Swiss-Prot record:
InterPro entries: ConA-like_dom_sf, GH16, Skn1/Kre6/Sbg1. The keyword Oxidoreductase does not apply. This is Beta-glucan synthesis-associated protein SKN1. CDD domains: GH16_fungal_KRE6_glucanase. Residues 1-215 are annotated as: Disordered. SUPFAM superfamilies: Concanavalin A-like lectins/glucanases. One of its GO terms (biological process) is (1->6)-beta-D-glucan biosynthetic process. The chain crosses the membrane at residues 282-302. Residues 13-25 have a biased composition (Basic and acidic residues). Residues 303-737 are lumenal. Glycans are attached at residues 403, 449, 490, 565, 590, 718.
Amino acid sequence: MERDLTYNAPKIKFTDTEGQEEHFYFNRSNNSTNDLTSHDSSSTQLQDANSRRQAPPPPPHNPFSDNSHENSTESLYQSETRFHQPLLHNDSNNSNSSIGNNRQRIPSQQHDTSSLYSASPISTSPLVSNFQSYSDNQDEMTRGKYNQNTNRSSSNYIQHSPTSAGYDRYPLKTQSSIGGSMSRIGLSSSSPSQQQQQHMYDNNSSNRSSYSPDSATDLMVYENGEFSPFGGYPASLFPLSIDEKEPDDYLHNPDPVQDAEYDKNRFLYDLKTMDKKSMNGLIAFIVMFLIAIAIFIILPVFTYTGYNPKAKNFENYEVLTRYSYPRLSAIRTSLIDPDTPEDALFWKSKNGEEWPLVFSDEFNAEGRTFYEGDDQFFTAPDLHYDATKDLEWYDPDAVTTANGTLTLRMDAFKNHGLFYRSGMIQSWNQMCFTQGKLEFSAKLPGYGNITGFWPGLWSMGNLGRPGYLASTEGVWPYTYDSCDAGITPNQSSPDGISYLPGQRLNKCTCPGEAHPNRGVGRGAPEIDALEGEIHGVIGRVSQSLQVAPYDIWYMPNYDFLEIHNSSITLMNTYAGGPFQQAISGVTMLNVTWYEYGDHQHNFQKYGYEYLNDDESGYLRWFVGDNPTFTIYSQALHPNGNVGWRKLPKEPLSLILNFGISNNWAYIDWPSLVFPSTMRVDYVRVYQPKDQINVGCDPTDFPTYDYIQQHLNVYQNVNLTKFEDGGYTFPKHKLIGC
């Protein structure tokens, strides 16, 4: 591809044969170097210059031409035709001109440059450049006429060295006599009509070349003998100079100031010159960034703060406790489970009254977990139950709900240095009740004739947290409202009847001492609906009330106890010990109520019903719908140096656990099966219509404030003494205030 050498070409001075100077500029239109436009618009000067032009002499003979034709210029042209398109024959206005052997190549308008090249076997070099120019008379153009200029003959001829095997790359100049030391390069000029005819002729003849001697030429003057590496142009007039600007100058001519400005404002410059594709990418990135902000920042903020622009109509619900939990996973707003069947909404009491259901949990939701804060009503502790020297570790992982039941699973799984793992849930400080009917439906673990397991369904006063020994010291299992020897350590008896430290929250606590409601004896009594054991080859359940202080020999007044079916129920031979008095009865169980065995595996109901009135109160236990035995409030009358023990008036929390301990029963290790699971179908609580009292912080027996003031003993399971939590036993009147 030929290079356009006239880009940003300088102004060139031309001189005609008479020495008259004319000023021309290279025409930059269409990237062509063929036309030169005169800056002098005077038609008179142009006509005078044309009249002074003379026809050029014939070019010298080229002895190195491969063509035998006498015209060397034509030979040059013919040798070059394989590199260029056919030339036009300019004979439109000068039909009588002498064509003869004086032919010059007329530049093709389809090329940027029109030059003759030597047929060098290696490269081609420009030999002669023919420039076309024409001037228009403005007045004649208006009238539709053109000024036909006479052809300007070129006086620039090239003489080749006879020693060259081909065309010389840097030919010698044959200088004109005009100007002495000046050489002239011919410039051809033709009228617009001639150019039009040349174009028409080019369509008819592609191989014919001719030249009209009438085409005018101008002479470009330059210093004699100046070396030119460009084959005909002097170096001083080469149109491309290092000082001239080109479109690609910014690639190899860095501008420190402009570059610094660009680096400083790179983003703005790139933004201004950004194409459509890049702009779409930027918009997509911004949209994705905003979406990420909304998902990972705004949404979590709204979720954490509970923001909701929509108004909610909250249902009324009963407040169980003022304790604030970190997270409420249960979705219930009622204490009664909506899955509870309608025929279980009422219970017929001992006196024939119908008590409504006030709380239930059917455990029908699959996959419930009971880690701290997971559930609305129950929590599975993560601890070792050291109070009874259990052999298992209670782990929340062992507790879940499946197939409509709560499952407490015991595995031979090493955990915290113990060889067994099992589960417990408790409603301490979450769900409590005072008076009423408590009912569990459960399937006991293992076989009905293999001893070792210790399943339990029971309740305890909310002032003591099961498994936290520091919290139960001095309150379990006290249910006492007197100020006598019963509140003192060991009941002030040297015979070892009691190892208890005394009632911590007694009736006669000194003013200013810590107490939930000073003037009332408080404690954490225990009522067991079920403690499973095996007697011989048959299972049985122990149901009991555990109280303090104790009767002499732990014997209540049995005149106020009633056994309803002596064929299956009898009083327990174990009546208590140094740490508690147990009014207990045992009832035989059916082997079909256990997990394993060659028989049906059914659920059975276990529970109790009680009223805590001092005169007419009672406590009755049940297996199924049948009562087993009943204790009346008069059975706990004053005895020895202690006064009345009360049927529990404390709010009672619920405990469901599956343990194993040598302190409870003989363990038949070879016969036990692991894993074994205790399943609970439901828990239900009924209360008299006029005495509904659900909650862990009732007005007459509050617990919340006291627990908050002594959180250390309720949250640190490793504390075994109340004083270990940083507290002291309150003083009372018997020892002085």
